[in-house]
């Protein structure tokens, strides 16, 4: 059994900070305390990739001298010689420092450095007697003094909220956190490349909207001082992107932030990243095929495979995604129902009441059969959709921007994609009939007046754009944060957002 020292107390930390501030004061007295004239020419990962396979004889013959810089994470002083571990943006490399090479003054200065300091090393690459690749320091400099001590290696950043609040410390201390955000970057890069390869134009649309639209959500409200008008942080870019389709861009996409003034949960953050794309002359069937491949390619870009492990269960994105209607999903995943029961509004309403839903309040009080079936699906089946599954054929009353089916009354050409019981994407054949769209906006206004805070506003300019004519179009939005959760085996959306929102510190 190994004994571990207790975690440092606040008093200990304050004492260490005071000692480090005193060291910094002495540095200021002797010259430039924070120099900015060192440029590294190598990174730890590159050195390991190039030289781990060579023995000392080959390294001596190669006579490779490098300049590296990074944070000192470990330090072992053994009289006239010392070892340190340097961590840069790519990984870690061992540093060997000795008094005979550095000189008395430089070696004495090194001994005063602290864990967390940013240092610069120049010297040859070699291997120790134990075979560890290292850099033998011919020169060593302190570039940036760390005033706050890092968490010790054993205790690390144990407080989950502290990891979110001080993500910079989490990134320093936790390899898994760095890998998560590297994977996120690769996933977004893979999505962007897939879109560009498919002929889509990347665009940027406003973040401040005079009318919130494009989704059913409660917006953040602000004020534009120069124009003296109320504005809203966007809840979705949809209506602006479709204006671009009207304008003649046939394929557009945007990766950017949305803001919804709603709750926080492991799946929800008020500020989140979406990728929305729109393609002229495409319908929702084409969208499902394209979205399936897009997500598969993002997984491969981020992890190297389309077969993943999420929360100790296999998640296979390599196979065709399932497609079910709302009722088919209920019958498959929620036991005990018949189609006849699902077709009875009174029965569905009674079932929702049993499940604790407020069927007397908005929006269910005014809901038709389709909306009631959707609510029952959300209560009984949604969380069970582990396999990638498209739920299709949503009712018109909950899909105010989607094209109605030509063959089924009250149904739209819309889908939502669920993976591991979470909504990942939402898409549909777009409604391009301006008169139908205006009528649906009016119905949304009535719902808002009846107490539905998430109902949409009437956007007259969007109707005007449609009146110029929009080609048949398909559009889809993908939640980047939720997708990255899957790709990185992260249980909470906060784990994949660098700086999630938290309550103010006391």
From Swiss-Prot:
EC number(s) per entry: 6.1.1.6
Top class in the EC scheme: ligase
Cofactor annotation comment: Binds 3 Mg(2+) ions per subunit.
Gene3D superfamilies: Bira Bifunctional Protein, Domain 2, Nucleic acid-binding proteins
Stretch forming the signal peptide: none
Transmembrane segments: none
BP terms from Gene Ontology: lysyl-tRNA aminoacylation
Cofactor(s) this protein cannot do without: Mg(2+)
Protein keywords: Aminoacyl-tRNA synthetase, ATP-binding, Cytoplasm, Ligase, Magnesium, Metal-binding, Nucleotide-binding, Protein biosynthesis
Family, per entry: Belongs to the class-II aminoacyl-tRNA synthetase family.
Protein's recorded name: Lysine--tRNA ligase
């Amino acid at each position: 059994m190994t004994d571990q020292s207790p975690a440092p107390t606040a008093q200990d930390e304050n004492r260490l900070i005071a000692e480090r501030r005193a060291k910094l004061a002495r540095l200021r007295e002797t010259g430039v305390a924070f120099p900015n004239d060192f440029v590294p020419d190598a990174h730890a990962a590159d050195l390991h990739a190039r030289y781990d396979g060579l023995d000392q004889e080959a390294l001596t013959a190669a006579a490779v001298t490098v300049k590296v810089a990074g944070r000192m994470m470990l330090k072992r002083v053994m009289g006239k010689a010392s070892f340190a571990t340097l961590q840069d943006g790519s990984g870690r490399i061992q540093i060997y420092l000795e008094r005979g090479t550095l000189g008395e003054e430089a070696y004495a200065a090194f001994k005063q450095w602290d864990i967390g300091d940013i240092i610069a090393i120049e010297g040859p690459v070699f291997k120790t007697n134990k075979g560890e690749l290292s850099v033998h320091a011919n020169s060593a400099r302190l570039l940036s003094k760390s005033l706050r001590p890092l968490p010790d290696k054993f205790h690390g950043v144990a407080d989950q909220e502290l990891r979110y609040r001080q993500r910079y410390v989490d990134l320093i201390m936790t390899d898994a956190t760095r890998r998560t955000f590297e994977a996120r970057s690769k996933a977004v890069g893979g999505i962007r490349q897939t879109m560009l390869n498919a002929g889509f134009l990347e665009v940027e649309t406003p973040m401040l909207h005079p009318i919130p639209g494009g989704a059913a959500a409660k917006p953040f409200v602000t004020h534009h001082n120069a124009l003296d008008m109320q504005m809203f942080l966007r809840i979705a870019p949809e209506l602006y992107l479709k204006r671009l389709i009207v304008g003649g861009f046939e394929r557009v996409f945007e990766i950017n932030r949305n803001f919804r003034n709603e709750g926080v949960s492991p799946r929800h953050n008020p500020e989140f990243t979406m990728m929305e794309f729109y393609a002229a002359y495409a319908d929702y069937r084409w969208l499902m095929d394209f979205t399936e491949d897009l997500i598969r390619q993002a997984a491969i870009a981020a992890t190297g495979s389309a077969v993943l492990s999420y929360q100790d269960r296999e998640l296979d994105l390599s196979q065709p995604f399932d497609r079910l209607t709302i009722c088919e999903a209920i019958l498959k995943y929620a036991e005990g129902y018949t189609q006849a029961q699902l077709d009875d509004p009174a029965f569905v309403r009674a079932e929702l009441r049993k499940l604790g839903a407020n069927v007397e309040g908005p929006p269910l009080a005014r809901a038709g059969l389709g909306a009631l079936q959707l609510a029952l699906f959300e209560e009984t089946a949604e969380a069970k959709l582990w396999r990638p599954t498209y739920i299709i054929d949503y009712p018109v009353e909950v899909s105010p921007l989607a094209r109605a089916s030509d063959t089924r009354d009250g149904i739209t050409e819309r889908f939502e994609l669920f993976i591991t019981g979470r909504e990942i994407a939402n898409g549909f054949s777009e409604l391009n009939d301006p008169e139908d769209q205006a009528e649906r906006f009016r119905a949304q206004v009535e719902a808002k007046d009846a107490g539905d805070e998430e109902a949409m506003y009437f956007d007259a300019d969007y109707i005007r754009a449609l009146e110029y004519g929009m080609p048949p179009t398909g559009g889809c939005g993908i939640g980047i944060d939720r997708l990255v959760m899957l790709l990185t085996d992260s249980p909470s959306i906060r784990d994949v957002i660098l700086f999630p929102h938290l309550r103010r510190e006391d």
